[in-house]
Amino acid sequence: MEFPGGNDNYLTITGPSHPFLSGAETFHTPSLGDEEFEIPPISLDSDPSLAVSDVVGHFDDLADPSSSQDGSFSAQYGVQTLDMPVGMTHGLMEQGGGLLSGGLTMDLDHSIGTQYSANPPVTIDVPMTDMTSGLMGHSQLTTIDQSELSSQLGLSLGGGTILPPAQSPEDRLSTTPSPTSSLHEDGVEEFRRQPPSQKTVVVEAGKKQKAPKKRKKKDPNEPQKPVSAYALFFRDTQAAIKGQNPNATFGEVSKIVASMWDSLGEEQKQVYKRKTEAAKKEYLKALAAYKDNQECQATVETVDMDPAPPSQTPSPPPVAAADPASPAPASTEPPALSPSIVVNSTLSSYVANQASSGAGGQPNITKLIITKQMLPSSITMSQGGMVTVIPATVVTSRGLQLGQTSTATIQPSQQAQIVTRSVLQAAAAAAASMQLPPPRLQPPPLQQMPQPPTQQQVTILQQPPPLQAMQQPPPQKFRINLQQQPPPLQVKIVPPPTLKMQTTLVPPPVESSPEQPVNNSPETHTVEETTPETICEMITDVVPEVESPSQMDVELVSGSPMTLSPQPRCVRSGCENPPVVSKDWDNEYCSNECVVKHCRDVFLAWVASRNSNTVVFVK
């Protein structure tokens, strides 16, 4: 490099080793000018023996650490910039035996500059972008690191004026520059791909979390609410008005009906009001019957339980004394082959929750294991069978008596009972309220959890809200309709000899409702004891130990007579005929003549009530 004095400076690049950097090529650089000159690219001869290190090595002459001066020159003199785009043609370099047919791309994130010791400091920017285009073939691309160029060229990055390169759309997406162009491109691709995937995931998660709203379907059997007196009047008069004025719109008809209703006499209005009141009463009765029917419908579920191991031998279950001071800690299961009854009754609806109960927060459950000798003689069973009786409220300690039948004596070896404190309290409360009439409440729900026939026991869980009976496929059933005496269920508690107490529990009567049959057996036996009093409802499953042809399913059908509403009559005054079912007049008239006469009477009364000056034209 030489900078001869004068107005013009010349930059000469010489290279003794390689012929493509000849000293004959000089670049004219005016001193202290404000203009920038675009220098054409240097044409390089194709030499396959050159490598990247050879090309970069010829820029070592440009670095002169001793010639760099302080920054006062930059502040005192204007800095001149030379843009030197270097183009390297196809087949210039060969590295590792692979032909670099795609060209060499060197993208510098920051321009490289240096200061020279000449009077006007000159900064040489060598942006190596915009290389040979269109030559991207199957070969690999060679990327030169910025730090490598800095070390090879010996150029200081912060000494001269740094020109920011033109940013591409990909560069604008990147937040921090990467030292390597390949890493920079990978980071850009990763940055461009990452946000859409995250957004997609968020949208999909939001879609999954959003649950569609389901509207509750209206039961067609539910009774419809009655309409008002004005609505009844509107039904009666709009047909006559539409018949006389076919072209009248609904708004006009509504205005006419409203004026007719306002001018209607109080007596005629009372007729419609009485009809509305009667319809409301009928609606309330029908709604009460509908709700009773919904509550009494049984939901049948089957619960399969593991059978008992075959090696188990029948042994008498232990007997737990009924201690009113301490509840039983656990329930006892009977032997697998012993004929017995297991009843689980949750008395939460009849007994207040006790804070001092053994299991905090859990409902008090009483499990009664009763042998078949305790059942009344009116219920017949097959030999070796087991009958499960579910009364409305089960409270017992030593015996269970149904109806007026006597209770057979039970040996301690055949009976195991566990009675909690809440059961005894319920029995005491029931004994205190024996003289009171039974409240009209629905019987507690029955949920039966049967087992396979090998275990020979049935577990029944009672819960207050819905009436549920659970049956199992293997057992065979029979059906019996029982009507018991006014005290249909007598529970006799005989703890120690010193304490004797007899409690009568009367299950509440139930409104009559259609009963869902649960009988699946071919044989059905019906036994009835007719009494005009209350009827108790229970479902009993028989699980015989030995398969026998006679099978029974006991079910008590509850019902009570309903008062019939008076016979409806035709709406037209003076007509005593019953109404005819028709959609046109809402089952309120007996014939078309009554409809016409009634509408005519109403319309004429409305016309007569208007002022005499008002003229009504009827087409």
From Swiss-Prot:
Where in the cell is the protein located? Nucleus; Chromosome
Q: Which InterPro entries match?
A: HMG_box_dom, HMG_box_dom_sf, TOX_HMG-box_domain
Give start-end positions of Basic and acidic residues composition bias.
Answer: 183-193
Q: Does the keyword Transcription regulation apply?
A: yes
Q: Which domain of life is it from?
A: Eukaryota
Listed Basic residues bias regions: 208-218
Alphabetized, the UniProt keywords read: Chromosome, DNA-binding, Methylation, Nucleus, Phosphoprotein, Transcription, Transcription regulation
- Activity control note: In liver, recruited to target gene promoters following treatment with dexamethasone and cAMP. Binding is decreased in presence of insulin.
Kindly list the positions at which Phosphothreonine occurs in this protein: T176, T313
Q: Provide the positions where the record notes the PTM Asymmetric dimethylarginine.
A: R479
Q: Where is this region: Disordered?
A: 153-227, 304-337, 507-529
MF terms in GO:
chromatin DNA binding
What PANTHER family does the record point to? AGAP000281-PA, TOX HIGH MOBILITY GROUP BOX FAMILY MEMBER 4
What's the protein name?
A: TOX high mobility group box family member 4
Q: What species is this protein from? A: Bos taurus (Bovine)
**Encoded by which gene?**
TOX4
